[in-house]
Amino acid sequence: MKSLAKLKSEKGIWLHDSEMPTVGHNDILIKIRKTAICGTDMHIYNWDEWSQNTIPVPMVVGHEYVGEVVEIGEEVRGFAIGDRVSGEGHITCGHCRNCRAGRRHLCRNTSGVGVNRAGAFAEYLSIPAFNAFKIPDNISDDLAAIFDPFGNAVHTALSFDLVGEDVLITGAGPIGIMAAAVAQHVGARHVVITDVNEYRLDLARKMGASRAVNVAKESLKDVMNDLGMSEGFDVGLEMSGVPAAFRDMLDKMNHGGKVAMLGIPSGDVAVDWNKVIFKGLVIKGIYGREMFETWYKMASLIQGGLNLAPIITHQFNIDEFQQGFDTMGSGQSGKVILNW
């Protein structure tokens, strides 16, 4: 079958003829329709230090997708041939304390689709049926293909009550922008997002952010004054992984504020812990999506009128994959879809 795989320990990704995946007793086989390029895929493409230490070569990559069930393992219940599905990319062990307590997003033995096992950038994908999520008929293939990163945004944004609150989001990548849209949709008062990429800040404005701030040109404090905010932000969503952005967030938080962190710093981060202590801040780390509460919330948000369509800015056929990766790497895009 046709696939996109990491075949060499160097920058790049290659179109490859891979073997069909096997289907176990508890698995389903999915014929892929659309996939989306993730930041993780870009790390693997660029073959950075994390990728070199994590990704076995060769490896079919990719974990954002939508497709159709074409084969079902003999022990599988609840799925039928023809079901349209996306899926949770974190394969959990099922036997650790957190898994057994229903907190599978905190499994200490997680295996990643397209990272530790064969991924979705292929004509077919086999995953445990437990990890598949049926897509409602009134949600498009395009939106279903980005449910994985949308789930990161939803998990982060809905970690704390946002109704009537002032929200600061640092990092206007696709996930940060979707988090801004979610915060606005569920009733936040002011949603302010920061970055230095004008293309993505403009996209954030289109997605409903109250203010999209280029911190290289504009003071966040001035923006707060313009909005009549005298006490600081109630909720912070750190999506950038940039130490300076996190420190600025802590400085601008109100006393008793709550911070959810999804962005991954490249190294150690120096923090003024006095601000955390004396402001009484709560900081929560976010990894992946809650299984499967986040997934049901995603579908409900879209069915309830949340418009994510503007975040999908480019589409390419799979034979044009190089153009897709170049576009994603340019920083001048939202989500990039590859059609199979």
Swiss-Prot record:
InterPro entries, per the entry: ADH-like_C, ADH-like_N, ADH_Zn_CS, GroES-like_sf, L-Threonine_3-DHase, NAD(P)-bd_dom_sf, PKS_ER, Zn_alcohol_dh
Residue spans crossing the bilayer: none
GO cellular component: cytoplasm
Chain positions recorded as Zn(2+) 2 binding sites: 93, 96, 99, 107
Top-level taxon in the UniProt lineage: Bacteria
Reactions catalysed: L-threonine + NAD(+) = (2S)-2-amino-3-oxobutanoate + NADH + H(+)
Localization annotation: Cytoplasm
Residues reported in the UniProt entry to bind NAD(+): 175, 195, 200, 262-264, 286-287
EC numbers for this chain: 1.1.1.103
Function statement: Catalyzes the NAD(+)-dependent oxidation of L-threonine to 2-amino-3-ketobutyrate.
Name of protein: L-threonine 3-dehydrogenase
Species whose genome carries this gene: Pseudoalteromonas atlantica (strain T6c / ATCC BAA-1087)
Gene: tdh
